[in-house]
């Protein structure tokens, strides 16, 4: 997992080249003006823009991926993301959805929480469990975010 901000002048230091290029591309866009839905960045990388309502972590499922990295960027609002600090016990997870590259689980072992603010991004590698769109300070809110899907083979 990597956490930084698109406004940090040194955000690219240490990032895999393809992730740095994705972030450079995002910095050319008016993120607030992006319409919800899928946007292809190229023939292998795409992003989903969404405006979900945050919710209590207990009402949400954690997710992890096998073939894609997530680059989650908060555009508007605040959200907590619960993150697993250790390799997940996959026996606790639902069956893998190969078509959409995810596995779900009710909760995350050995978790910590990251509070996201606008222009921050978090990179989740395969098998890194995360539970996005959780409330901050117990207050639900409608947020706007995007999730870039990068095939792990490009890293």
Curated annotation (Swiss-Prot):
Organism: Haemophilus influenzae (strain ATCC 51907 / DSM 11121 / KW20 / Rd)
Gene Ontology CC terms, in alphabetical order: cytosol
Any one Pfam family match given in the protein's UniProt record, by short name: DUF386
Taxonomic superkingdom: Bacteria
Alphabetized UniProt keyword annotations: Copper, Cytoplasm, Metal-binding, Zinc
Record-listed Cu cation binding positions: 65, 70, 130
Reported function: Opens both the alpha- and beta-forms of N-acetylneuraminate (sialic acid; Neu5Ac) to provide aceneuramate, the preferred substrate for NanA. Has preferential activity on the beta-anomer rather than the alpha-anomer. Accelerates a reaction that is spontaneous at slightly alkaline pH, facilitates the reaction at acidic pH.
Keyword Cell inner membrane belongs to the record: no
Gene: nanQ
SUPFAM superfamilies on file: Clavaminate synthase-like
Cofactors that this protein relies on: Zn(2+)
InterPro entries for the chain: NanQ, NanQ/TabA/YiaL, NanQ/TabA/YiaL_sf
Chief location: cytoplasm
Record-stated family: Belongs to the NanQ anomerase family.
Reaction equation(s) it catalyzes: N-acetyl-alpha-neuraminate = aceneuramate; N-acetyl-beta-neuraminate = aceneuramate
Molecular function terms from GO: metal ion binding
Cited NCBIfam families: acetylneur_anom, YhcH/YjgK/YiaL family protein
Protein's name in the database: N-acetylneuraminate anomerase
Cofactor-binding details, from the entry: Has been crystallized with Cu(2+) but reconstitutes with Zn(2+).
Compartments, as annotated in UniProt: Cytoplasm
């Amino acid at each position: 997992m990597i956490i930084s901000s698109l406004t940090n002048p040194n955000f690219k230091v240490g990032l895999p080249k393809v992730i740095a290029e994705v972030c450079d591309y995002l910095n050319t866009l008016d993120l607030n003006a992006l319409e919800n839905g899928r946007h292809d960045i190229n023939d292998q990388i795409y992003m989903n823009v969404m405006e979900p309502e945050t919710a209590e972590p207990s009402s949400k499922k954690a997710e992890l991926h096998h073939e894609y990295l997530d680059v989650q960027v908060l555009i508007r609002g605040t959200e907590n993301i619960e993150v697993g600090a250790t390799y997940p016990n996959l026996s606790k997870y639902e069956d893998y959805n190969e078509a959409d590259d995810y596995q779900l689980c009710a909760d995350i072992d050995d978790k910590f929480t990251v509070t996201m603010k606008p222009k921050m991004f978090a990179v989740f590698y395969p098998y890194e469990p995360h539970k996005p769109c959780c409330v901050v300070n117990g207050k639900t809110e409608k947020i706007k975010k995007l999730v870039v899907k990068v095939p792990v083979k490009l890293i």
